[in-house]
Amino acid sequence: MGRAARWFKGMFGTKKSKDRSHVSGGDSVKGGDHSGDFNVPRDSVLLGTILTDTEKDQNKNAIAVATATATAADAAVSAAVVRLTSEGRAGDIIITKEERWAAVKIQKVFRGSLARKALRALKGIVKLQALVRGYLVRKRAAAMLQSIQTLIRVQTAMRSKRINRSLNKEYNNMFQPRQSFDKFDEATFDDRRTKIVEKDDRYMRRSSSRSRSRQVHNVVSMSDYEGDFVYKGNDLELCFSDEKWKFATAQNTPRLLHHHSANNRYYVMQSPAKSVGGKALCDYESSVSTPGYMEKTKSFKAKVRSHSAPRQRSERQRLSLDEVMASKSSVSGVSMSHQHPPRHSCSCDPL
């Protein structure tokens, strides 16, 4: 009987304790492996401790029930054996094989029922452990998902910031050249406007100078100076007689004569015979505006000179300072109408 009790204890007690210790050790190892990766909350830890305590209590109860049933079976078997032996001694009763087989069957059924009870208890414990482990695993998975979501949110925020920065840079790069072009256009417009204003000023100056030169030319052509007018380079000599500012006619209109030399070209204005004294004037405007191929030839000049009356000289008279300055200002107004006038000179051609 003692052997049977020890066998039951070894069958249901020690093996169960070893298996449970092995299972709990494996769980602890697994938990240790994952403890660095995930932090289990306090609620799950408390729940795990409570479940382990309940499991331990249930295991103890199952072991106690198994040991009690085993001891009861051993006691019953031992009582039956003692009874049989006592009866055999008393009445010399012989135990047959059938009775032995019947006793073995009874023990087998009893032990089977005890084993089924212990198996049911173990199944309940295993189911409870599976539920606890599933709860813990789900808790860890939820924590992992939350951490991944936070990480993804941070990454998306950083990416959005980078994209916004890149877009702002591209936008600025797109609009900077436009601003520069606008500035360039404004600058060019200002330059053009200043150039146009300068051109207008030059045109006005030229038009005014041309009008002045025309007025001077008309006055010179319609007036008859008393004396000779000689112009060569920057030298100016004016000689007038008493008779001044006569109207031009067919007989007293001055004629233009040309004298060529090696260095200078002379233009001579010659008066007709009716004039009192020799008169000459340098028609600067006509000399500048008239090209060379339109000038009068020597033969034409000779014909004109032959048809004209002989020239009479009069007494020369020096002009006053005011008259000289007025004539000089009129000549300078004529010369301002041209930027680079050629150098001409005029001299009187006495006859």
From Swiss-Prot:
Keywords: Calmodulin-binding, Cytoplasm, Cytoskeleton, Nucleus, Repeat. It comes from the Eukaryota. A motif (Nuclear localization signal) lies at residues 191-198. Residues 15-37, 299-351 are annotated as: Disordered. Residues 98-114 are annotated as: Calmodulin-binding. It is found in: Nucleus; Nucleus envelope; Cytoplasm, Cytoskeleton. The keyword Cytoplasm applies. GO terms for molecular function: calmodulin binding. This is Protein IQ-DOMAIN 27. Belongs to the IQD family. Gene3D superfamilies: 1.20.5.190. One of its GO terms (cellular component) is cytoplasm. SMART domains: IQ. Residues 312-321 have a biased composition (Basic and acidic residues). Residues 324-337 have a biased composition (Low complexity). InterPro entries: DUF4005 (IPR025064), IQ_motif_EF-hand-BS (IPR000048), P-loop_NTPase (IPR027417). Residues 99-127, 128-150 form the IQ domain. The keyword Electron transport does not apply. Pfam families: DUF4005, IQ. Binds to multiple calmodulin (CaM) in the presence of Ca(2+) and CaM-like proteins. PROSITE patterns: IQ (PS50096). May be involved in cooperative interactions with calmodulins or calmodulin-like proteins. Recruits calmodulin proteins to microtubules, thus being a potential scaffold in cellular signaling and trafficking. May associate with nucleic acids and regulate gene expression at the transcriptional or post-transcriptional level. Residues 299-310 have a biased composition (Basic residues).
